[in-house]
């Protein structure tokens, strides 16, 4: 294959990048779609008096992926908020987040940057109980921190701005980092809050437990109801599907463009080869019919008009095949009629 027919480096990089991005997006889409399908297949169980009876009749006294909703109740002690009075919960998360501006040497802009510099999570055992009074049933929640959607509520949030002197400001400007301050946050799962648990529901020694599911399914302890949770997951699936289609179309369009360019170049090469064969055949026919005196003049004739003598040497290919008038009539960019290489320089040829 000639070098002109090969895809450019930019085209190869574009095709490879778009293909790789499409593959990554498709993998994420498959994972999201699988999670949504698993949520649709989860069994909804009412937190009531018949809960233990339902589990005792289930295979292995277990529902592998169940949905249950109830109110949060501590087993023994509770956690008190450090900043809000009379705020009690069963999970407490304290975070310190640093905010600063970082100079981007590529875009020459200051960009916002934040990172967690300290985080501590405290938990105490808790149950899910029915909202109705007088129902003596509860579900013990195990390993709540393994949940992918822990329904914590922000109960306190305060930003502490950085205090800088003039010399500090100059030093930060030179270093490329300008601190803005520290954000202090407290999140809690309050006692009495409504929680939707999705996981493995097990009856063990007359006690019901909700724990992380097996087989790679996701564990949820969400403040949203099940329908809202499912709708959010399906919306995420649709978004990733659109991204896959967009990048997939871009990949197919790039591949089509490269293949079309290859096809057109091949057709042009075949056409030029056919023209050259027809010319050689016609020249041989003229030579066979011409007298010996005319054969020498025909060999020196321009391959385009066959009337004038060859008077141009084309570089870089070195072919001598055209008169000056036919060379000037060639379309831009000018190419050799024999090999189709671009003509970079012309040397006049003088016939004696």
UniProtKB/Swiss-Prot annotation:
Tissue expression remark: Expressed in cortical neurons (at protein level).
Name of the protein: Mitochondrial ubiquitin ligase activator of NFKB 1
Record-annotated disulphide pairs: none
Catalytic activity: S-ubiquitinyl-[E2 ubiquitin-conjugating enzyme]-L-cysteine + [acceptor protein]-L-lysine = [E2 ubiquitin-conjugating enzyme]-L-cysteine + N(6)-ubiquitinyl-[acceptor protein]-L-lysine
Compartment(s) where it occurs, according to its Swiss-Prot or TrEMBL record: Mitochondrion outer membrane; Peroxisome
Biological process annotations from GO: apoptotic process; cellular response to exogenous dsRNA; mitochondrial fission; mitochondrion localization; negative regulation of chemokine (C-C motif) ligand 5 production; negative regulation of defense response to virus by host; negative regulation of innate immune response; negative regulation of mitochondrial fusion
RING-type zinc finger segments: 302-340
Domain notes: The zinc finger domain is required for E3 ligase activity.
GO molecular function: identical protein binding; p53 binding; SUMO transferase activity; ubiquitin protein ligase activity; ubiquitin protein ligase binding; zinc ion binding
UniProt xrefs under Pfam families: GIDE, zf-C3HC4_3
EC number in record: 2.3.2.27
Species the sequence originates in: Mus musculus (Mouse)
Membrane topology: Multi-pass membrane protein
């Amino acid at each position: 294959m000639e070098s002109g027919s090969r895809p450019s480096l930019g085209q190869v990089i574009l095709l490879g990048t778009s293909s790789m991005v499409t593959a990554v997006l498709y993998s994420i889409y498959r994972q999201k779609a699988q999670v949504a399908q698993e949520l649709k297949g989860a069994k909804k169980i009412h937190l009531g008096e018949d809960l233990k009876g339902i589990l005792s009749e289930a295979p292995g006294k277990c529902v592998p992926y169940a949905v249950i909703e109830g109110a949060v109740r501590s087993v023994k002690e509770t956690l008190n908020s450090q900043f809000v009075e009379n705020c009690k919960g069963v999970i407490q998360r304290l975070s310190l987040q640093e905010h600063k501006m970082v100079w981007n040497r590529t875009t020459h802009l200051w960009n916002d940057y934040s990172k967690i510099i300290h985080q501590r999570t405290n938990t105490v055992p808790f149950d899910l109980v029915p909202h109705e009074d007088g129902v003596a049933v509860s579900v013990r929640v195990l390993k709540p921190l393994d949940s992918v959607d822990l329904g914590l509520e922000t109960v306190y949030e305060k930003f502490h701005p950085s205090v800088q002197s003039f010399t500090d400001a100059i030093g930060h400007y030179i270093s490329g980092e300008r601190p803005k301050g520290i954000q202090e946050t407290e999140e809690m799962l309050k006692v009495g809050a409504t929680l939707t648990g999705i996981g493995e529901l097990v009856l063990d020694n007359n006690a019901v437990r909700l724990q992380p599911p097996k087989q790679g399914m996701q564990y949820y302890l969400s403040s949203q109801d099940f329908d809202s949770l499912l709708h959010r997951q399906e919306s995420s699936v649709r978004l990733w599907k659109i991204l896959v289609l967009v990048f997939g179309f871009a990949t197919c369009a790039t591949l089509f463009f490269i293949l079309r360019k290859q096809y057109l170049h091949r057709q042009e090469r075949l056409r030029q080869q056919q023209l050259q064969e027809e010319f050689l055949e016609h020249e041989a026919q003229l030579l066979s019919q011409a007298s010996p005196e005319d054969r020498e003049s025909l060999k020196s004739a321009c391959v385009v008009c066959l009337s004038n003598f060859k008077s141009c040497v084309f570089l870089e290919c070195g072919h001598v095949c055209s008169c000056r008038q036919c060379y000037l009539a060639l379309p831009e960019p000018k190419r050799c009629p024999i090999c189709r290489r671009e003509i970079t320089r012309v040397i006049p040829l003088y016939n004696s």
